[in-house]
Structure formats: C-alpha cells, structure tokens
Amino acid sequence: LSSKEWQLSDIGEWAAANADRIVIMPRAIAATKRSTFEQPALLFECLDLLANEYTQVKTGKADRFAFKNKADSLGLDFGGSVEPSVAGEMGDLYFVRWHGRRQFLDQHLCKGNARDPRFCMRIYFFYDEDTQKVIVGHMPSHLPTSTS
C-alpha cells in the first residue's frame, strides 16, 4: 500500500485498507476529503506512525522512543488535545461515539502552528485499550479551542 501516492480524496480507501490497524471515523474521513491541506503524504505518514509505532508503544512492543524519535524526525508535536473542561464547552467536537460510548479525543499529533489549513495539520484521536487501536476522530484541521 505504501507505494501508492495517496491523496486526501483517497482517505476512505486508505481507511478501509488499514482498518485492521487504525480506525478513521466517518467524520474524519469527510473532513479530510474537504481539506485544503497541501501535504497529503505527511498526513498518511502520520497515520502510519499512529498505526505502527504509537500502537507498538501502547501495547508494550516498543519503547516510547520508537514513536518519539520518528515523530521528532517528521517535525511533529504530540500531546493532549485540550482540557476536558474546554472540550465540554465545545459540544461534540472533541468527542466521538465508539462502541456505544462517548469518547474524548484526548490526544493530538500536529505539524505547524499557523491557523491556515493549507499548512497546518492536526490529528485528534484516542487509544482504545479494548481493540488496541488508535481511533481518529478529526483531521487534518484545527478544532476550535474556545467559543469565540
């Protein structure tokens, strides 16, 4: 699969082909198809990083540097998305329904700090211990952090 040059419009196909390693929620697929982000190869590389190294760290198959070193080499920042109190003020933006439960997209992987969606990427996700998969709820744009 990695030999194909994936475009943002291919995200549904990519998600289906990789569903055994990572889950891309329908709203993340829809937002990606509408996106103007200019580095699709980076987005797919980040999804691979979450499906591979991040999941290996979470399942104890790799130490955290396996993920951190690759994220650093791609110029990515990784961390918590927003405080739960902020997320609560934003309605359902920071939450997805997963296996009948409301789940907080508590992590994000990001590149760039400009608000311009052509140059800035955010992948909001949570890790599901039961399935041992990353669940991506929104990408590749910023989610708002206040109601202003």
Regions found by a protein language model. Name each.
Residues L1-M121, D128-S148:
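Basic, Lys/Arg-enriched alpha-helical interface segments
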